[in-house]
Amino acid sequence: VVAFERAK
């Protein structure tokens, strides 16, 4: 997933 990276 990239949910954490997209938070940036």
From Swiss-Prot:
Protein name as annotated: 30 kDa non-secretory protein 3
Organism, as annotated: Mycobacterium tuberculosis (strain ATCC 25618 / H37Rv)
Lineage: Bacteria, Bacillati, Actinomycetota, Actinomycetes, Mycobacteriales
